[in-house]
């Protein structure tokens, strides 16, 4: 069974029922500060940590005097707009005593469908982690109408985990794992300790285990598990209401682990390799050797570019003899790539009229 301290990069999803008192609508400050202590402990061990947090609507509705029942879409968006400020400030205040810098990142599931936005969000998160910050990710509830209606922070957390190549995703929830049935309705329901494969029988067991404040249920958690494990990320569902929930999990709290068969990097390369290329980039002999040595593809090593493709689109990488070396996600459009081919990275801004990334295709976005 996995342990948190063996992870390199960890994504933790926090449900709104954990952050907000269901009776008063107030923030559970003591719980949040205990979570912050856990994050500091993990970072002290060398882990990268990203938090994906619900709670903006739950916090905002109390400030606006809205009922704690289902809200019309416009009121949900208004509550999110008010609550998001308070949510970000609460995390900043909780982590500041540990000398941890926080960053707010608002995304939607649609950001993963547009490859240009996907690459941009990935680069931003990687930069924040490299600088030692803890990104606090939330879906942009003020504009993401589908996400508000259906509650997708579980899947959003899985998408973030896959995007950044995390090896573990922890869903802190109001249930302590995945059961054979809904334990509130079925006293005979039993909890799985480990699920190695999500079978049709497992899917059929997923019932709605949501709360009055959380909008996600067990079905969305199972969808998150499918997405995460396919991307090489193991996932755990555990009950998160105790203080210091991550240390509690590390010390043996009840949970269900969904195992991943591939490591994140291998899963990502398989995903890239399976895409249909939108163009070809032919490299010179020096660049071909550099790629084989694990380097990124720089404009200086590009001999020719064919095809009409956009930023983030997959392209085939060909050697000087026309042999296919692999493929990757290009950080420039076809026209931009043609303009900067053969040039030094330092000349990109002068050539295009605006600054760009040094690599045409980063090694992390390449499958050879």
Curated annotation (Swiss-Prot):
E.C. no: 2.7.2.11
InterPro entries associated with the record: AceGlu_kinase-like_sf, Asp/Glu/Uridylate_kinase, G5K_ProB, Glu/AcGlu_kinase, Glu_5kinase, Glu_5kinase/COase_Synthase, Glutamate_5-kinase_CS, PUA
Primary location: cytoplasm
Reactions it catalyzes: L-glutamate + ATP = L-glutamyl 5-phosphate + ADP
Binding site for ATP: 13, 173-174
Binding-site residues for substrate, renumbered to this chain: 54, 141, 153
GO molecular function: ATP binding; glutamate 5-kinase activity; RNA binding
Disulfide bonds: none
Every PUA domain range: 278-355
Pathway given in the UniProt record: Amino-acid biosynthesis; L-proline biosynthesis; L-glutamate 5-semialdehyde from L-glutamate: step 1/2
GO terms of biological process kind: L-proline biosynthetic process
Database matches in CDD domains: AAK_G5K_ProB, PUA_G5K
GO cellular component, as recorded: cytosol
Sorted UniProt keywords: Amino-acid biosynthesis, ATP-binding, Cytoplasm, Kinase, Nucleotide-binding, Proline biosynthesis, Transferase
NCBIfam families, per database record: proB
Similarity section: Belongs to the glutamate 5-kinase family.
The protein's name in its UniProt record: Glutamate 5-kinase
């Amino acid at each position: 069974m996995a342990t948190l301290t063996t992870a390199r990069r960890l994504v933790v999803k926090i449900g709104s029922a954990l952050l907000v008192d269901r009776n008063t609508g107030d923030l559970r400050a003591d719980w949040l500060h205990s979570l912050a202590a856990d994050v500091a402990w993990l970072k002290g061990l060398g882990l990268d940590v990203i938090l994906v947090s619900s709670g903006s609507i739950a916090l905002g509705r109390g400030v606006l005097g809205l009922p704690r029942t289902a809200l019309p879409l416009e009121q949900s968006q208004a509550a999110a707009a008010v609550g998001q400020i308070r949510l970000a400030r609460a995390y900043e205040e909780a982590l500041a005593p540990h000398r941890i810098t926080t960053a707010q990142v608002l995304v939607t599931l649609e950001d993963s469908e547009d490859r240009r936005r996907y690459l941009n969000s990935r680069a931003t998160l990687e930069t924040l982690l490299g600088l030692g910050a803890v990104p606090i990710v939330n879906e942009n509830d003020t504009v993401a109408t589908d996400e508000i209606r259906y509650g997708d922070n579980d899947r959003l957390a899985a998408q973030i985990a896959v995007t950044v190549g995390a090896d573990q995703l922890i869903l802190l929830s109001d249930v302590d794992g995945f059961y054979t049935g809904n334990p509130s309705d079925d006293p005979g329901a039993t909890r799985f300790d480990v699920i190695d494969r999500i079978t049709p029988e497992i899917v059929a067991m997923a019932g709605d285990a949501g709360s009055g404040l959380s909008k996600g249920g067990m079905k969305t958690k199972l969808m998150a598990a499918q997405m995460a494990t396919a991307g090489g990320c193991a996932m755990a569902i555990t009950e998160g209401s105790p203080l210091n929930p991550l240390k509690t999990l590390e010390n043996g709290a009840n949970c269900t682990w969904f195992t991943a068969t591939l490591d994140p990097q291998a899963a990502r390369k398989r995903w890239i390799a399976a895409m249909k290329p939108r163009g070809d980039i032919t490299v010179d002999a020096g660049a071909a050797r550099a790629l084989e040595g694990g380097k990124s593809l720089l404009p200086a090593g590009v001999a020719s570019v064919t095809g009409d493709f956009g930023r983030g689109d997959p392209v085939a990488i060909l050697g000087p003899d026309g042999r296919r070396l692999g493929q990757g996600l290009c950080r420039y459009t076809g026209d931009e790539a043609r303009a900067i081919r053969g040039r030094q990275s330092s000349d990109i801004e002068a050539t295009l009229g605006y600054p760009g990334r040094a690599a045409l295709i980063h090694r992390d976005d390449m499958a050879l």
